[in-house]
UniProtKB/Swiss-Prot annotation:
GO terms for cellular component: cytosol. The gene is valS. Coiled coil: none annotated. Pfam families: Anticodon_1 (PF08264), tRNA-synt_1 (PF00133). This is Valine--tRNA ligase. It comes from the Archaea. ATP binds at K520. It catalyses: tRNA(Val) + L-valine + ATP = L-valyl-tRNA(Val) + AMP + diphosphate.
Amino acid sequence: MEIRKDYDAHEVEEKWLKLWKDEMYYFDWNSEKPHYIIDTPPPYPTGSFHIGHALNWCIIDFIARYKRMNGYEVMFPQGWDCHGLPTEVKVEEKYGIKKGDIPRDEFRRLCVEFTEENIAKMRETARRMGYSIDWSKEYITMYPEYYSKTQLSFVRMYNKGLIYRDYHPVVFCPRCETTIALAEIEYRQGKTKLNYIKFDDDVIIATTRPELIPACVAIAVHPDDERNKHLIGKKVRVPTTPYEVEVIADEEVDPEFGTGVVMICTFGDRQDVKWWKKHKLELRNIVGRDGRLNEKAGRYAGMTIPEAREAILEDLKKEGKLLKQVEIDHNVGTCWRCKTPVEIIPAEQWFVKVEKEKILEAAKRIKWVPEHMYSRLESWVQSMEWDWVISRQRIFATPIPAWYCKNCGEVVVAKEEWLPVDPTATQPPEPCPKCGSTEFRGETDVLDTWMDSSITPLMICGWPSLKEYPTHLRPQGHDIIRTWAFYTILRSLALEGQIPWYEIVINGMVFGEDGRKMSKSLGNVIVPEEVVEKYGVDALRQWAASGVIGDDIIFNWKDVIAASRFQQKFWSITRFTLMHISDYTPSEEDKKLLRDADRWILSKLNRLVGEVRKHMDEYRFDEAIKAIRTFTWYEYADNYLEIVKNRLYSGSEEEKRAAKFVLSYALDVLTRLLAPITPFMAEECWSHFREGSVHLQSYPVVEEEFLDERAEKAGEEIKEIVAAVRKFKHDKGLALNAPLKKLIVYSKLDGLDVRDIAGATNSEVEIVTEMPEVRERVKELKPKFAIIGPMFREKAKTLIKAVGSLSKEEKERLLKEGAIQVNLDGASVEVKAEWFEAVTEKSIEGREVEMLETANSVVFVEV
């Protein structure tokens, strides 16, 4: 069968996408193979499969394919985390509506349709990338079969006392008009003004948020601050307001910030919440859910926060209370979605209890890769100041399965058998357990999207009737440790009392070629389709493999190009191999025919197998692909294949069979080594010389019979000798296949095989085990004109002629002693050896030779 010379990645990929069957990757609960269950991240269906997705899923696919080839029954599911604000915004934009303009169920229907379209686009890209996903295990969180389980988890945690409703300060996004969790706050660096404001003559505070002055409920100083501790207990009037507050002491006040005097507002930040709780202060909330100040702000009521800031500063100036303003660097808490500065306001919300110590103890029982990523979770958990707020003021999300009795206000949470349920559309089938009323108001708040995605390991294992648990692996990015990883551990403990996975592998983010975060405004965004269109999927997958797990990775076109070139190289190796083994069937007898070079490369190849297996087991895909490529290109193609070509073309039948055995074996092993990383190329190569799919084969294991230290030494020596002779020919301007008179090789290794040295150098070869006596004589002394010319000027030529006429013995004495006396126009002149370059000739046993030294041998080229 004729095989084209150039590897066409697009043609190959298109071919196998049509031929591969989904059933190849279906997970069977009844399989007797050991199970390996991957809790894959369900992406948000934006419709665009970005480069970060490509990286994440490549890593997952490397693991899934590797584990399958090692005899595991692998579950690689695909989910879609659908609910959330971005879809609501896109639907509002698409249809030119606001969510309140149409019935809730109609708005949700539009969101579902929009999301289904996006899922279809992303599903197509995932298939195009060759990911070995079990599509029979696909889940979509917006469908009742999934969100009914989210609701079930809510009910069970509520019944365990782990979910409760309370009036408490929460983080609120005025633009999105919903609460968000602490983990969803993004801090953005910027510039702001630190305002120095006089409350009383001796009370001056410094604040970045003057608009919250009407919410000031106390002034605080550090108890040991010599400048300000005399103020403790003093009553102070709050400027621009009718309020009076007390100065209190607290150790958490930073005496070095501003004036060392701070105002406590309800609420400027999380520190205010801590102080409010600790000192049992008054609650005066002045910011509404729309981001405007309310009636408690007095004359500033109805203003937006920026408007109130300007108005209050203007009033302070008029009253002479604004002493100065200083520009400072400032971190502002913003909404993770819309980047609007968030506010902390008190509200009646649903919360999940966060049991910090239990979560951290469980997290320690999980293997973290890299290990240091655990500390990120630990730092986040320790920094949490209140429980997880799970209610959101949106529509497109899992409904909270609860009602409120209109008669007595009793909260009625759904029973398990009522699920799934939308409380805004359905009344509970039973009367109020407290007063017997049948009049209810359905909960209009919905659940945080993380309530859906934090039960993914439970869902894929059949919860609530678990078939197996925990899962084996959670692969995810470091950017969602404090959300997805944290919430999943919390929920798994709450619902099943177990860790969700045995191991968690954390990958990094993808940055542009300029080393910065990808952004349309920076013009450094790369999409997977662009890479695939130019160089194919496997080249992109090799790039993904080049990143170190846990580290951020820079997208670099040169890495993709190098990957593409390697594929062409491997394809050329495959073509060369198939050309020679088309009529060959390996046999055990052929092993007896192996020569030094054969045993060398087989030993090196098996050591490569051991090295790659170790790297793959440790998720060091970067080291694995590097080792495979280095061996394949340099050891195997550039050296072994070049060494045995003469044997393949001109050798005896036995010599050919030995080489063909190696070619067949090496192509088999290398193709299987590459299969998890370059599935298309591996399948195409495999199909030309083996039956079935390479992805249904076993991953290579080290075959001890081929490990041979003596052969490795011999092979390295042969490689060095051939390389030295080739360089000699190149330097002499000879063709690489030009014959040489004879090579005499001194080697300390007993029985070094000369067949392949002779064939690769096109020369007669003699091996000697004792170093020959090398005689060296001066053939010529080349003058260094740059030295002699300036020293002797018009007599330089005479000096050079005089030295040239010296006898061989005199020339050798000059080199040995460093200087001799020479007669120059009747005068004795000292001539130094350093003025000349000695050209010598070597000989052994009377034969003139060129001597080439390698690391392990000496080669004499007879001339």
